[in-house]
């Protein structure tokens, strides 16, 4: 992988020291508080799943502990997040495997390897969609599904972008220097078009309203798309 500053080095570090439990619930919404759960992924019994941008591994750990998949591959490009996840939930191997790689890098060459791919404000948010979505479709088995949650609008209220362009958002390097990173906050119709152009069919969308009126509350856009059976 390229040697670049790990902009996720600090994210979730404090929580990892005080909360090591496998979550009892799976949430898609921005606040991780309400709305639909793992049922959106379908029947997971005996299925092979991949999480794109798995962070500390909490969603993947929940699925392994409560939904009996054959395997979950939890993929993250951040060295710190990968190490944190493995330290928290590595004991759930061999059904849970943490992979240190970028999402596009991991999916290339894995044609028809997965029944389900998902992302909870993960790699789909932080990877050029025109690079990620086609390889995600190819990595799914016929009839397989991709489900991801993303911001329905920018945190702070600015509308989502009307075309496939990224927004620069604040970030920090491991030594604390202030930099920026790219996040794709796209309008619903833009995501639908990007998915269809990447080979997906049956695209479904749902907007999950923000929980409460907190300063950083934001609506969630939940998208489900399928690789064609034929």
Residue ranges and their predicted role:
Residues 1-45, 58-62, 145-174:
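Conserved class I S-adenosyl-L-methionine
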Residues 108-117:
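A short acidic, Gly/Pro-enriched loop at the edge of an enzyme's catalytic core
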Residues 130-142:
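A short glycine-rich, Lys/Arg-flanked "PGG" loop and its adjoining helix->strand segment in the class I
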Residues 182-199:
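Short alpha-helix
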């Amino acid at each position: 992988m390229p040697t670049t500053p790990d902009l996720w080095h600090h994210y979730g570090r404090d929580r990892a020291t005080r909360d090591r439990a496998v979550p009892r619930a799976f949430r898609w919404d921005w606040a991780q508080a309400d709305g639909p759960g793992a049922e959106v992924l379908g029947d997971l019994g005996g299925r092979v799943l991949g999480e794109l941008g798995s962070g500390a591994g909490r969603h993947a750990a929940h699925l392994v502990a409560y939904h009996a998949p054959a395997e979950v591959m939890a993929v993250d490009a951040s060295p710190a997040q990968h190490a944190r996840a493995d330290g928290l939930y590595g004991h759930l191997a061999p059904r849970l495997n943490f992979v240190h790689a970028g999402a596009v890098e991991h999916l290339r060459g894995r044609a028809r390897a997965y029944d389900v791919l998902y992302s909870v404000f993960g790699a789909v948010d932080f990877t050029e969609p025109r690079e990620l979505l086609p390889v995600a479709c190819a990595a799914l088995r016929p009839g397989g599904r991709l489900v991801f949650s993303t911001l329905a609008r920018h945190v702070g209220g600015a509308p989502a972008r009307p075309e496939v362009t990224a927004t620069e958002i604040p970030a920090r390097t491991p030594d604390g220097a202030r930099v920026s990173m790219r996040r794709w906050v796209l309008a619903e119709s833009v995501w639908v078009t990007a998915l269809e152009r990447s080979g997906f069919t049956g695209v479904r969308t749902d907007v999950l309203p923000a929980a409460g009126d907190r300063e950083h509350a934001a609506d969630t856009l939940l998208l489900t798309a399928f690789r064609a059976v034929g």
